[in-house]
Amino acid sequence: LSTGKIPDDCDTLIICTPKKDFDEIAANAIIDYINSGRNILWLNSAVTSEQNFPNVNKILALYGVKPFEIGIIRETDSSKMLQGSPDIIKPDALYSTITKDIAKDSGVRFINATKINLVSEEELENLKVNKTELLNASEKSYFRNNFKIQTDEISSSDVAGKFLVGAELEKTITEANEENGTKAVKSKMVIYGENNFTTDYPVSNYSQVTVFQLANNKDLVLNSIAY
């Protein structure tokens, strides 16, 4: 990205939880990449401190994604968590090209996940973005932004509800026009509110099992890249 151009043979650009803002050169390179009709896999873990990333947010905004909030998703439904750990959630997998086999099987597991906030349906339409929800945290989950609270039960400062944690966002760059032979140009962003599920992050301090090995996490990564 520092060269100002993403290689032509890069069909899917993977972005994992930016730790600092993109500079103008990198941001413009990504925008050019998007406008050429290529795809992004965006993996974002929970945000734990205030961030000022205008260029990162500018890229997300092209697909209707709002800036990530400070906080983490936790679960209260024992059937939607791993071994009594409310921070390791089992999101509901919705039927889609990426998740159809995962939805039929044992799903996926996310640790320290965050919610994906999108603009309104009307604003998505104005951006020419078509949304497909892939994964949702259950209706019994909650979003906690006060990390000093140690209890597993939902507190008065937590936000309860079902949260979007995986989505496919297809943006139309150029409309097809049969009269002049113009072909449609579209760019897809597949986005998840988690990135540890793609890594060797340990499930706990006492386990050699990694999050990547859980359930269908590996398949979700591969499907998202190949799609």
Walk through the language-model features, giving the residues of each.
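Acidic, S/T/G-rich, low-cysteine, solvent-exposed domains in lumenal/extracellular/periplasmic regions
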Residues: 1-227
